[in-house]
Amino acid sequence: MNYALDALWWKLTSQPVRDLASLLTAPPLWQSGCELGVRELLGERGFRYLLALDADPAPLTEHLTRRAPFGHRLGIYAEELLAFWFANAPHAELLAHNLTVSGSDGNTQGAADFVARLNGKPYHIELTCKYYGGGTGRLEDMRGLDPKDTLLGKAAKLTAQLGLPHTSDGIRTLRQHGLPLDVKPVSIVRGIGFFPHGFHAFEPPLNPYGWRGIYIQDWAEYGFKRQEVRYHLLDRMAYLAPARVAETETLNATEIRRIDQGLIAVLECRPDGFWHEIERIMKAV
């Protein structure tokens, strides 16, 4: 699936609102077995609320300003976007954020990203946003730009995190904070899987309908068949949503070939005068 082509991206213009929308509506990169669905995340009035935020993003931008700086840590930024949503969306109530779970010896066991009510139901919610690629498409080869960051490792860690509030230490922590004990563990797994051109043999738990991009190690693998497109090297903090940039922020095919490593948005110009992402590339080394 090329999530960048969703009609939503023709409408939203505020960058933080676009980032928030991607967390709420993108397909999971892999299937944890307990995904929190888009319907639950958005609620009945969530899409209208997103449009209202896009028209006046001040409440969201002010929230982010209070929480900044994020130290170039995409995960912290993404958590703050969702914390705003759970605290302000019409159907949501934020009960706890980064709830530390400690053992009886005082040692930290971990932390729950969120405890929140959605439509009155209590959830323990874990968020992860990852960008993995590999030249074979096999699970064991799926890695981030940092080769130590692997899909299999992160998936295992997520499973452990989801079980945390249901341990004896987790239950005690929930009780100490006056939180519901019957929280349902759910995940929000976002990001992009990058595969070689024409690859379709997705292994579980990869989501065959996830947001996909192109994986290359040499620019000669890409082809550059489309003459009308331009390119943009994405800053790490701009990974979440499809890019929407001014022409001054774009590069041509010759310039982009000088990039050794990174995530690159392939862009087309749309009637609003901005260049919009239509495909994403992971250039690895």
Which stretches of residues belong to each language-model region?
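Intrinsically disordered, low-complexity Ser/Thr/Pro/Gly-rich regulatory segments
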Residues: 1-285
